[in-house]
Every structure is written in structure tokens, then in C-alpha cells.
Amino acid sequence: MEQTEGVSTECAKAIKPIDGKSVHQICSGQVVLSLSTAVKELIENSVDAGATTIDLRLKDYGVDLIEVSDNGCGVEEENFEGLALKHHTSKIQEFADLTQVETFGFRGEALSSLCALSDVTISTCHGSASVGTRLVFDHNGKITQKTPYPRPKGTTVSVQHLFYTLPVRYKEFQRNIKKEYAKMVQVLQAYCIISAGVRVSCTNQLGQGKRQPVVCTSGSSGMKENIGSVFGQKQLQSLIPFVQLPPSDAVCEEYGLSTSRTPQNLFYVSGFISQCTHGAGRSATDRQFFFINQRPCDPAKVSKLVNEVYHMYNRHQYPFVVLNVSVDSECVDINVTPDKRQILLQEEKLLLAVLKTSLIGMFDSDANKLNVNQQPLLDVEGNLVKLHTAELEKPVPGKQDNSPSLKSTADEKRVASISRLREAFSLHPTKEIKSRGPETAELTRSFPSEKRGVLSSYPSDVISYRGLRGSQDKLVSPTDSPGDCMDREKIEKDSGLSSTSAGSEEGFSTPEVASSFSSDYNVSSPEDRPSQETINCGDLDCRPPGTGQSLKPEDHGYQCKALPLARLSPTNAKRFKTEERPSNVNISQRLPGPQSTSAAEVDVAIKMNKRIVLLEFSLSSLAKRMKQLQHLKAQNKHELSYRKFRAKICPGENQAAEDELRKEISKSMFAEMEILGQFNLGFIVTKLKEDLFLVDQHAADEKYNFEMLQQHTVLQAQRLITPQTLNLTAVNEAVLIENLEIFRKNGFDFVIDEDAPVTERAKLISLPTSKNWTFGPQDIDELIFMLSDSPGVMCRPSRVRQMFASRACRKSVMIGTALNASEMKKLITHMGEMDHPWNCPHGRPTMRHVANLDVISQN
């Protein structure tokens, strides 16, 4: 017996070649993976042949037949024999040609693999041939039948019963044909968008019914026109063209790129993307197409970056994206995966930096647009003042000693109008501070409040101040709104800074701060804003650390408002009333210099006298202790091995706790749980064998009510006065027609006109309404996307789920409600009837493991 086993082992270890037929089937199954891959290979062959018209015909979504016809150059008769043989191609002759290949195909595997997986028939006619030829191939790619076949120039490839030579895959293919079909259509849409000057059409025929158009393009030469042909003109209204910008220094630093060493003009990116305004995006990533040298691909990093940047401006939607990256073919490796969808790219970080900089620049310019209502304002005296936006953006002319007088009366009126407008914003009048001559300047200094942190360093750049000099100038910063002035008035009253009577008619001076300061000193709340103190500075020495030059305000004759400097006041400084100051205060005497500041922050080594003490230590006692611990650990090992729940009750371990519950608790166990009581009028304590659980009574009841509403509620429909036309693609329209019952349960009703053109057959006649909730076409798009992935499965739009979650919350048992034993048992039993009992619709956990009684008793 032992001798026989040894012989069989030796035979199993022998290395032998696999027969050619098995190799062909194994490798072919790795080339053609799905319906979309098969269609992709045939479409690429037609485009490589120079076709301007490509017609794709499907029967039963591609299960029975896939047929692609084109008007390309056709196949010459001398190439018939090698047409469907493995690794036979006219695209390349050697490996070196791979870097210069410009066609989609180059490996010579597509037709050979299709022959191994299905029945393939090809009819073709070359431009030099007088009549076409029909070729029938066997599963090895060899011609079994060759007959004359009259047809125009071009090629038609028919693939029947795809995957039928692989029984398991064929059954799986039939079962998931709707998903396969949806993926195929998305791949086809990518080729329709990028193929300029090529008219692509696709039809599907169910049984003996009519051929239903799926996609149809007009053969336009531009990408924008192709997008409109595939997705409709409405989609174009929300798109903006991609504008490429060179990578910024900040983005280059983020990706570890050197701006001096990065190659210039390596990539050229073109395409379109959704506007960042809410409503312009989509609820899913179903319309995102990326191309490298016009080859459709799936660049995961690029896709992730585009969505992340878009979510910076529109958190709740995804963009429609069509981007084509043009780059030298020597910088690209397309021979990575069988379907050629994964592409390796040199300088990928540079491409990401270019995309991020460009997208941020595009969205910033779009997000910063604000529509301003031109409304008249009242000045202090009650007169109307017209708001001129263009005039407000101009700097206010200063009245300097050497400035020329105004030449035009129109200019004087304009200045007067703006001055009166600024006075209208001055809601808190204070006494005007007189000018002290050319040798002095006024400095408005802001002291940090007790909540404000102390700045760590002085600004090192040269400070430029804007303002006006003179005793009659009354300024308000254009960045100050009326609300800000009101907040400032409140602060000054609270801190005792108001020093004028209510009847004073003189305006207060609020010089404008340089824009470079605003980012360093943000005001988070009225309570956190700095209280202000006006100090008259004679010889003010504004000297940045490390420089020998001093910047004196009197050299410029400007009134300035300075930022709080470092260490200007302790962090716990209280607010105080304004006191009279001497006319000349030398701020530099009160401020610690750079040297003293840095010296206070440096740790100084201190010499310490340490006393040495002998410690008694026994190695034998330590070894004895270690043996005892190991023995105790061995005893407890089998006792602790049965612990099923180890996650803590904390937000950071919610996912781990949920995974443990899903693994260890089945639906039938809820009925077996023993009710121990109610804790804190909000939680039910249950016991299952030796495990104690805590159940949130509100969350558990809310989830049960939510699932019941999801399953059984039929939304009431509000009929429209006139049917509404939907801007759907042919594929989305087909999905809608096939799932009309699910739409009706969600409150949407349609009228279907079979004789109408495709994309215009379905019209909306009623919408769901429920009290204050209204729904619209965007919910229809979301349902179509969900049904494309799971056809025939009952699903709800996200806004319907939100409505059900709100209703379930209001009708559930609330925290603080006392429950008797039967009511608590009812809630626990309901948890066993749910599909997902671990979280309420708003994300709160319903149940957590508390303790194991065996572990507690042992301890």
C-alpha cells in the first residue's frame, strides 16, 4: 500500500507539457473576461481598420449574439488563414515596436480567444476584392468554411453563445447578464466619446421583438458633440472645459516634486468636468471616463484625485468627467493587463500635480462667484446712497499733503457718495483723534483676549500700510460689514472701551488692515475678538528681527492698524477700560527683543547632584516569578479562548464590535435572549447564555420601524398636469422600462410610447409626495443607477430613505420611556426580524456586548 502511494506521488510531481487545446482554453478565458471585454475587442478592431461607421447588434443583451459591422478597409485574402490564430497580428513585428504602437490592438489574441469561447463567423470584403468572403472558424481559430459573400467594403464579426464552451462561466454569465450589459454600455460610451469622426450605433433585440437602440452618435469630430450625442444636450449645460495649469509650488511640495527638475509640457490634458455647484454633479461615479492617448483606461489614482478635489467644493455629489491625457508613447506602458485598462505611466506624480492644480484653479474661480443684489442704502442722515460695486472695489483716495486737488466735480461727488456710504456703516460713533503732525503717527493696536493664543514670531516681510492721514478723514474698512460693526460695539461696551456719549455725531476711524494680515489673525466669535486700544506712538521702531532697518510710520505719513505682536500681553490678560496714555509711548521698550524672547524658550541644562543607592536584586527570585506567571498563563489559556467579544464600547471600535456581533449572533438568538431589565430608562439589559448585552431601545425600535416602512410603504403619487419629458439615455430608458413596478412603489409613474424615438419613449406623469417632502427627476436618475447594478431588486432613493428614517425616529420608543417586560421582549424579538439590526438609520449602534459572566466570576 505504501509503495503504491509513493508511485502516485512521483507521477504527480512529474513535469509535463499541457496539451495545446487546454492551453488555448485556459489563456483565452484570461483574455476575454466579460461581455464588455468581447465588445471592446471588436470595436477596437473596427477603429484600427479605419472605419467611420460601426454598428453593434445584440440579441438578448449579448447572450445569443454579438455582431459588429464596420466600413473599414477589410481583410485581404492572403491574411484569412492567420486572422483568428493566436499571436498573429499586423500591428507589430517585434517587441521594440511596442513603444511606438498607436493602434488599440497589438497582441493578436482577441479573435483567437473569441473563437475558443464561442462560435465565430466573419464576413469581409477588402477594397481590392470584387466580392466579399464569409469565413467560419472552429474553436482553434482555423477556417472550417469559406464561401463567397456579396457585401460592401468592410468587415462583420458575429459571435454566438459567448462562453458556452466554459459551462460554469456560461451559467454565471446568463445569471448576471443585466449587470454585464450595463458595464458593456459604459465601456461602449467611452469609445463613442473619444472616437472622433466615427459614427457608432448599438441596438439590442429581445427575442423576436423590435430592435431597440441603445447608443447612437453622429460621427462628430469634437469630444463635446459626442458627449451631447451620448448623454443628451442637458448634460452639456453643466460641464466646463478643462483648463490646464502648471503645477503650483505647494502641490509640487505635496507630491515631493522639484519645480526645477520636473519636465515641462510632458502632459497635455483636455476634456470636460462638471461644475462644482450643487446640482451640477451626479449621485454616483457612473459617468467618469479617462483616456491616455485616446485609449480608455482605469487610472485609480487619477480618479481618486479628481473626486477628492471635487468633494472639496461639492461634498454630496460626484463629477461627470471626461479627461484625455496626451503624452509621448515612450512614457506609457499599456501591456500590463489582458484588457489593457491598467496603464503604467512615467512621471505619474507630475500628472497628479498638474491635475490637482488645474482643478483647484478651475473650481476656485467658479466657487468664488457671487451674485450681488444692487439695493439702495440709507446713510446716517436718512438719504439714499446707491451702491456702486466697481467704485467700492477701488482704493479710497487719500488726502495727503503733497496730493493734488481733485480736478473733476464728478470725482468729488463720487468721493462724497462713498464717504457718506462708509458713514452709514459706522454704527458706533467715537471721538475723532486729532492728527499729531508729520513726526508722529497713530497706531491702533489689538490686544489678544484671554482666549487668543500668542503669536510665535514677528512678520518678517516688509509691511505696507494703507490708510489716510489728516484730521478730517473718516474711514471704514470695506471688509467690515454692518454686522461686524455691531459686534464691535457690543464688545467695546462689555469691555468698557466706549468713551463717547450717545449723542456724539463724529464718526470713528477704522483704518484698513493689509490683506496679508487677515489670514494670521482670524476672528472666530464676538467673544474671542481682541479688544482694541488706541496708542499714540511718537518714535515707533517697527523692526523685523534679523534686519537692521527700522520701519517708521512717520516716514510714510500713513495711519496704520498693526497686528498684535508676539508676547504683547500674557494669555490670561483681562479686558480693561481705555486709559489716557502719554503722548509718546515707545513700544519697543515694552516689547521683549528677539534675543530675550528666544532665550526664554530655550531649555537650559541644569547640573544636578544625584545620590547613588544600591538596589538589592535576586535573579533566582525573578526566574521563580516568571515561572509562576507562565504557569498561570497556561492555566488561563483554555479558559480565555472562548471569549467571542473583545471590542470595547467606544466610537473607535464600532466597526469591530459590529463585525463581532454579525459573526456570533444569528437572528434566531434574539428570541432566546433573557430580559434582565431596563437601565437608565434608555437601554435594555439582556442575557444570552453567559454573555450580557446592552440594547438601545430607541435605536432598535427605530431600525425595525424603518425597515418596515422600506418594505411595505407605497408612496402616494401626485399626478402632473402635463407629462414631463425625461432626458434619459437609451440605456437608462431601457432600465426604467424594465423596472416600472419598482418605480411605481416609489411613487413615480410613467407613460410608455413604444412608437416614439428612443430616449423619448418614457414620460413622467406622476411624482411622489409626502407632506413636506417633494421628489423630482434627480431621484429617478439615482434609482436608475441603483437598478443598473441590481436589476429587479426593490430599492429606494436616498431622499426617500431620509424621509423614512425621520418618520421611523418619531414613531419609535424614546429615551426616557419606562418599559415593562413584555414591551422589552417585543423590541428584542423584532431585532431578529430585521435584515440589518446592528445600526439605526442614522448610524447609532443598536446593541453592544457588555461582559461575560464566566470571566467576571473567575476574576
Swiss-Prot record:
GO terms for cellular component: cytosol; MutLalpha complex; nucleoplasm. A motif (Nuclear localization signal) lies at residues 574-577. Its EC number is 3.1.-.-. One of its GO terms (molecular function) is ATP-dependent DNA damage sensor activity. ATP binds at residues 45, 70, 109-111. Component of the post-replicative DNA mismatch repair system (MMR). Heterodimerizes with MLH1 to form MutL alpha. DNA repair is initiated by MutS alpha (MSH2-MSH6) or MutS beta (MSH2-MSH3) binding to a dsDNA mismatch, then MutL alpha is recruited to the heteroduplex. Assembly of the MutL-MutS-heteroduplex ternary complex in presence of RFC and PCNA is sufficient to activate endonuclease activity of PMS2. It introduces single-strand breaks near the mismatch and thus generates new entry points for the exonuclease EXO1 to degrade the strand containing the mismatch. Heterodimer of PMS2 and MLH1 (MutL alpha); this interaction is required for the stability of both partners. Forms a ternary complex with MutS alpha (MSH2-MSH6) or MutS beta (MSH2-MSH3). Part of the BRCA1-associated genome surveillance complex (BASC), which contains BRCA1, MSH2, MSH6, MLH1, ATM, BLM, PMS2 and the RAD50-MRE11-NBS1 protein complex. This association could be a dynamic process changing throughout the cell cycle and within subnuclear domains. Interacts with MTMR15/FAN1. This is Mismatch repair endonuclease PMS2. It comes from Mus musculus. The gene is Pms2.
